[in-house]
């Protein structure tokens, strides 16, 4: 089932029939109420209501400058909203602190890869900084699955933009978080890599996870409950 909603200067998600009858049950674990965002002297959006249950995929769209990145950064706790509240499992994310952070994986529109480090070093160090220790053998297997076999030890600066993007996306194979916030992660990916990302997200949803993906591309999934949220300027 697909739902969509668009408005001007505001954004609101239609919660009718928003329950997901999948492995994760039927309880909305992410609830956003009257959320607003102001950058400088410009209001990006206001009155955003969102109610999300396990197994839900939200495709976040809108023109450049409409607030997609700001919304994702607010949802992951990196940016404070101008007004409104975000609840996770019934509790305000501000009160949850690190407990909420441990449930979230945020990948920004930049791949976040350190160019002086190898693909292998990037994956292991990034995950260690996020509290996930992985062995060298596991990291090599993940990079192989991401189509980077033979390039694991190369400095990231020698990789193509698409390959660096794959290094960043490799985190999704080793994280154990419930909420994925992905900002334009399909950029610079070929069809094979897009198919791989689709498979990763579908598996995440099947396990009761939630994925909110900001993208300019049409990105359909074959599983889970799909909603569309469009921000406008």
Model-derived regions: residue spans:
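Catalytic Walker B motif of ABC-type/P-loop ATPase nucleotide-binding domains
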Residues: 180-184
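Hydrophobic anchor residue at the start of the ABC signature
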Residues: 169, 208
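Conserved ABC transporter NBD signature motif
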Residues: 81-95, 99-100
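Helix-to-loop junction immediately C-terminal to a conserved catalytic motif
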Residues: 76
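Conserved ABC ATPase "signature" region
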Residues: 124, 136-151
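Q-loop/switch helix immediately C-terminal to the Walker
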Residues: 110, 115-130
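Conserved ABC ATPase signature
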Residues: 116, 155-162
């Amino acid at each position: 089932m697909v739902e969509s909603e668009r408005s001007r200067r505001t954004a609101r998600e239609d919660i009718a029939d928003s329950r997901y009858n999948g492995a994760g049950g039927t309880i909305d674990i992410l609830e956003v109420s009257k959320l607003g965002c102001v950058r400088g002297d410009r209001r990006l959006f206001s009155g955003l209501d969102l109610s999300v249950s396990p197994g839900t995929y939200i495709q976040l769209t809108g023109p450049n400058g409409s607030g997609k990145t700001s919304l994702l950064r607010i949802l992951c706790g990196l940016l404070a909203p101008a007004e409104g509240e975000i609840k996770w499992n019934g509790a305000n994310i501000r009160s949850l602190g690190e407990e909420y952070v441990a449930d979230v994986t945020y990948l920004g529109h930049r791949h976040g890869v350190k160019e002086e480090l190898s693909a292998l070093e990037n994956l292991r160090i990034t995950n260690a900084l996020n509290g996930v220790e992985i062995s060298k053998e596991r990291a090599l297997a993940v990079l192989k699955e991401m189509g980077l076999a033979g390039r694991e030890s190369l400095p990231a600066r020698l990789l193509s933009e698409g390959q660096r993007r794959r290094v960043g996306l490799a985190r999704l194979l080793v994280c154990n978080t419930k909420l994925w916030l992905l900002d334009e992660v399909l950029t610079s990916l070929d069809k094979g890599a897009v198919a791989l990302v689709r498979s990763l997200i579908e598996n995440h949803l099947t396990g009761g996870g939630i994925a909110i993906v900001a993208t300019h591309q049409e990105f359909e999934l074959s599983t889970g409950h799909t909603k569309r949220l469009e921000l406008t300027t």
